[in-house]
Structure formats: C-alpha cells, structure tokens
Amino acid sequence: MQTWLFVAAGGAIGACLRFGISELMALLLGRHFPYGTLVVNVVGSFIMGIAFALISHGHVVEHPMKPLLMVGILGALTTFSSFALDTVVLAQQGAYLKAVLNMGLNLSLCLAMVLLGMQLVASRV
C-alpha cells in the first residue's frame, strides 16, 4: 500500500511540474510550438537515465522511493500522449514542418538525454 501512495504522490508532483513548466515555456516562448512538452520530455529523459544508471550500477538499491521518482514523478512529468497530440494538432493546422520538427526533436533529444544521464553516472563509477 505504501508503494501505491508513493506513486500517487509522485504523480501529483510530476503533473504539477509538467503544467508549471508548460505554462512557463508558453509565457516565455509563446504557444506557436509545444516547447513545454519538449522541455519536460527532454529533462525527464535525462533524469530517468541518471536514475536508471544509478540503480543498474548498484549505487541505489531497490529503494522504496524508486516508484515515487521513476513511475510517479517522471511518469507524470514526461508524457507521450501530449507529444502525440501536439504533433497531430500541428499537422492538422497545416504546420507540417513544425510537426516533423517536434517528432525529430522529441525523439533525438530524449534518447540522447537518457544516454547522457547513463553515461554521466557510468563515468563517475
């Protein structure tokens, strides 16, 4: 039961972070491109890579807080469904270049951030 509460608490934190970051990015850069979704996906992927590498290398044992971070916070912070919706909406609006750019940036940057996070931990081991 405690694990479920950790996941729920983490989900609330991650969802609030996602909303706040998305609103901040819209305020700073405008709503003509889904910068908020891109930022949360890239940052969340980087943190996920670090967390995974720490656990894989035995620096963080299967801790009860792992579900809070990896499933709760990062699961709610990053969101494939928002990425997919943003991309479809851009395409429906005829902004095909932005839709393709959104797909390319999310895929390449998120994969790179997971790898970077893992390598950052591996270089310190």
UniProtKB/Swiss-Prot annotation:
The keyword Nucleus does not apply. Disulfide bonds: none annotated. Pfam families: CRCB (PF02537). It is a multi-pass membrane protein. It catalyses: fluoride(in) = fluoride(out). It comes from the Bacteria. Coiled coil: none annotated. Na(+) is not transported, but it plays an essential structural role and its presence is essential for fluoride channel function. GO terms for molecular function: fluoride channel activity; metal ion binding. The chain crosses the membrane at residues 4-24, 35-55, 69-89, 103-123. It is found in: Cell inner membrane. Na(+) binds at residues 75, 78. Keywords: Cell inner membrane, Cell membrane, Ion channel, Ion transport, Membrane, Metal-binding, Sodium, Transmembrane, Transmembrane helix, Transport. One of its GO terms (biological process) is cellular detoxification of fluoride. One of its GO terms (cellular component) is plasma membrane. Fluoride-specific ion channel. Important for reducing fluoride concentration in the cell, thus reducing its toxicity. Belongs to the fluoride channel Fluc/FEX (TC 1.A.43) family. This is Fluoride-specific ion channel FluC. The gene is fluC.
